[in-house]
Amino acid sequence: MGCVCSSNPEDDWMENIDVCENCHYPIVPLDSKISLPIRNGSEVRDPLVTYEGSLPPASPLQDNLVIALHSYEPSHDGDLGFEKGEQLRILEQSGEWWKAQSLTTGQEGFIPFNFVAKANSLEPEPWFFKNLSRKDAERQLLAPGNTHGSFLIRESESTAGSFSLSVRDFDQNQGEVVKHYKIRNLDNGGFYISPRITFPGLHDLVRHYTNASDGLCTKLSRPCQTQKPQKPWWEDEWEVPRETLKLVERLGAGQFGEVWMGYYNGHTKVAVKSLKQGSMSPDAFLAEANLMKQLQHPRLVRLYAVVTQEPIYIITEYMENGSLVDFLKTPSGIKLNVNKLLDMAAQIAEGMAFIEEQNYIHRDLRAANILVSDTLSCKIADFGLARLIEDNEYTAREGAKFPIKWTAPEAINYGTFTIKSDVWSFGILLTEIVTHGRIPYPGMTNPEVIQNLERGYRMVRPDNCPEELYHLMMLCWKERPEDRPTFDYLRSVLDDFFTATEGQYQPQP
């Protein structure tokens, strides 16, 4: 290969493509027949750019036209129904419900923001994922429902205005993996992965690599599968009547009460936590719930609504695979390799880093309070509830329900709960993850755990636990709370750990 400045023989057109340091132009194969434009300011742009998650866009749509990605049946007064593919004009863009007019019927009403995409753009394409990180692309493509050759195109995290192609592949050594290719821009508006062949648009690029791998790891088969999104909760529906909820299936019972799968107003699938009567003050609960509903993050279970008359109901988003501690023991959970387990730990650390940033405390962090979606996304539940419990069996150190094995020594001995006691609990949670749901301190009673901790004992490294991960656990279990790491640090280490275990890019054949 060569450019105007060198003839270094290399052929790697993956995301770490070589660009000449002097002319800033891609190093083109010497035997290539393609004639790229003469250097005239076409260097690859490299400013860093950050992207938000799947939230409503902050800036107004330029032409106010959107296209429906899914059909929507109205469920509230003032809603506007529409069919998939229908075009609408946005009249007011605020929050998660936008006022719109159908160009088909002329009717006006409110629509859920996540059911539509900007018209005359890439956003309606099933293979285009606008605000998706590299790591989340891997999570989505490796989720159930996707297969060899499943793919997506996303905005580049490192280069503004550029895109990356992510493809699911099978590796003989690593099993199912995701490989990433940088899509480069031409001055004339075209695109290329390898300069041997360029395309006027991304549609042409997708069409070409669907018909032939042409140097990629595999042919593109079908776009990454996603489920129809849950419509946003209606903002005014916070304190709701009990009659609006139908409890369908009892999912389990925990320290606070029972958990049910149910439906709100007959159409929205939700999880309902029914708290035991007398377990907490309704007034104290409502005050805390108003704080909890402000904590919105992709790694936190979304709190939708409450019933404030006893028995208190907490209505949240429904997570198909239930609690992490139970899921890890299922056939699907047992099959998860250490890479995926570490990814789950990284997701939880990400959510706890947000709680840390908000100066909030969980107080009961363990695998039983982590929920798992159908795409194996992990979300933190029950944050803040432990503080409100008025049951002595739960709050007293000797209480039968007190989670001794997850609780930091200062919280056991003095009732001192801080974000640093949450860090201790996170270290215990890591042992649950790598052992597929084993109870911590196997073979020990709660009093024995307390006695051993006072003597400086720490849990031994579980079987199959990487040394680096055990080192992270030991940092979480430092005696002095101030010596324990932050969740932001834990998140960064686990993110790097996850990336490192995925393996480096391989040269394209």
Curated annotation (Swiss-Prot):
Gene disruption phenotype: Mice show a dramatic reduction in the level of peripheral T-cells, with 5-10% of wild-type levels. T-cells also exhibit a 10-fold decrease in proliferative response.
Signal peptide: none
Domain SH2: 127-224
Effect listed in the UniProt record for changing residue 3 to S: Abolishes plasma membrane association. Reduced palmitoylation level
Crosslink site: Glycyl lysine isopeptide (Lys-Gly) (interchain with G-Cter in ubiquitin): 99, 276
BP GO annotations: B cell receptor signaling pathway; CD27 signaling pathway; cell surface receptor signaling pathway; Fc-gamma receptor signaling pathway; gamma-delta T cell differentiation; intracellular signal transduction; intracellular zinc ion homeostasis; positive regulation of gamma-delta T cell differentiation
Segments forming domain Protein kinase: 245-498
Distribution of this protein across tissues and organs: Present at a low level in most T-cells, and at an elevated level in LSTRA and Thy19 (T-cell lymphoma) cells.
UniProt-annotated stretches for the region Interaction with PTPRH: 154-242
Activity regulation comment: The relative activities of the inhibitory tyrosine-protein kinase CSK and the activating tyrosine-protein phosphatase PTPRC/CD45 determine the level of LCK activity. These interactions allow rapid and efficient activation of LCK in response to TCR stimulation.
InterPro entries: Kinase-like_dom_sf (IPR011009), Lck_SH2 (IPR035850), Lck_SH3 (IPR035749), Non-receptor_tyrosine_kinases (IPR050198), Prot_kinase_dom (IPR000719), Protein_kinase_ATP_BS (IPR017441), Ser-Thr/Tyr_kinase_cat_dom (IPR001245), SH2 (IPR000980)
Resulting phenotype, residue 270 to L: Reduced activity
SMART domains cross-referenced by the UniProt entry: SH2 (SM00252), SH3 (SM00326), TyrKc (SM00219)
Enzyme class at the top of the EC tree: transferase
Coiled coil location: none
Positions annotated to bind ATP: 251-259, 273
The protein's name: Proto-oncogene tyrosine-protein kinase LCK
